[in-house]
Amino acid sequence: MKTIIFVCHGSICRSPAAAFMARKYLKELGREDEFKILIRATSSEEIGNDVYPPMRRELIRRGIPLYPHAAQRIRQIDYDNADYIFYMDYENKYSLMRQIDDYKSILFPINKWTNSITEIEDPWYTGRYQLVCDEIEECLKDIFAKM
């Protein structure tokens, strides 16, 4: 079983959306037993908080099953046990590079195999939850097509 960690700044919008969408997509593909999906933050600002309400509403609107969630900051032990860590934007990447030893081998942008998307913007600032979920969905399809 491969361990994938989705990471964003606070772990209340993008990374939980990616994880919940990935779980649904993998179940549809019959591949849910191949992957352990985790959610982490690069900051400690939102530790313990659930998914941000506007993102929660967008996931519900899309029929994405929600799971219990309390934001956690990524730790070295998470990295040590991960096969892939997918970050949403370059701010996340630089935060991870400062926090994690030997980050290079498993740290990837979520859009690694998606040419049409440069970064996943933070909807907490932009309010564009639908667009963010559309982009995450496209990235996830490309990720799991390659794995």
Please report, for each region that a protein language model flagged, where it lies by residue:
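Phosphate-binding/catalytic loops
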Residues: 84, 90-147
